[in-house]
Amino acid sequence: LGPLTYEAQRGMFVHPTYAVTPQREPLGILDVWMWAREKKDDSGRRGGPKESLRWIEGYERIAEMAADMSSTRRRYVAGREGDLMALMERADALGNPADWLVRAAYNRSLPEGDKLWEYATHDEAVGEIAFP
């Protein structure tokens, strides 16, 4: 077991990828990523793989299923801790077999030096989706 939110708490993290219908009916778990964090080193950093990789791997599982679900529209929703650029690049490399959405809570810096909100809202919106 490894540290959780606080170093004194011990346990494991679980990141499921699950499927639901447009009517919100659960279909089941497609993939599960489990890990225990390593302790922080003297500089306050943790070793091991970046935890944001779990979002990329979840998208890859959806992409693997795309051939068997050609008549189904697939959407992948990543949490705000997902690596936006890495997910965009991986989706593009796989041919975008599923729509994707990354929830974002912060105005992140982009590789070119721009900020996310300004970049994303620079052009006129091409559509809008409302979630009840």
Predicted regions and their residues:
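Conserved, well-structured functional cores that handle cations and Mg-NTP chemistry
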Residues: 1-132
